[in-house]
Amino acid sequence: MYTNEQEIEDFLQEYGRSRVIIETTTRATLNRAVEFEYKFNKPFYQFTTEEALEMYESVHAISVVSLQNNNLVLKHAARWFAYKHKKTVENTYEEMTKELLSEVVDVNKQRSLILSREDINNLKENLLNAIDRAIVEMLFLGVGGEWLKELTFMDASQVDKENLIVYFKTGKRIPITDEICDLLMEAFAEEELMSFGSTSRVSRVAGRWLYKVRCNALSDNSDYNDEQSVERRYRFIQRRLLLISKDLGVRLTSGGLQSSGLLWHLQRGVEETGLTFREFVRTERAKELAQRYDIRSDLYAQIIIEKFEQYFV
């Protein structure tokens, strides 16, 4: 007997009692396991190591951390379902090591700077700080501008919570969801304890922006027109992206995240309108996307075609 939807609901309810979970991701992990039950003709909690790795390989994960999180869900789920069905089985997921999981990471995708919306969501789920999650999300949505000033000088006053829009001095307007709105509010208010070197004292860093400074800093670099302030804030974002890349084992750049976001919007546009890629690029909607992602040339259509047509072949 394979796993059914009611059993998944029961497990999610039980699993959520003992830990904070992101239900959509946990459910997706379980649903993928159910798909492979039909392939291997057995319940997922009876999968062998080789079968589990084949399932994980189908995820095309860019980070071993993401696979470890999936495996953690299935490890607990396998215990729960085996107990429920009174089965004594060897829990493959208990023995799954980081080394084994690293073998099924999609290396080609990992090296690419272009990430899907699913990749971005998985990355965010592996980030502990609201600041880092907000930086990744905002870059993906097209917030940037010259020297990333739109991002680094962003504050809560720009967020229209009722209409779910973020407004910028540059005239840019970014629609957001309730979830992203809550994330931004959390990130603006977030404080951290951080050491700026191996021998440096741990300091509290805070600020009303995504940019944070030590609480005892002489300046918060808040002058939008001051070159040094802009540069310090820009370096702050680049340093955060470097640390995220190092921690998760992926390549993250501000340009790569913005290109990923633009491609995602282009793909949605083509799907929703039924137009070909080249036809869609010449629509008013595509022009607005180009401006949103700081492609302000009159040749924006040709620039987009040259950069992204390979993804629509």
Identify the residue ranges that each predicted region occupies.
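Short, charged phosphate-coordinating catalytic segments
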Residues: 137-163
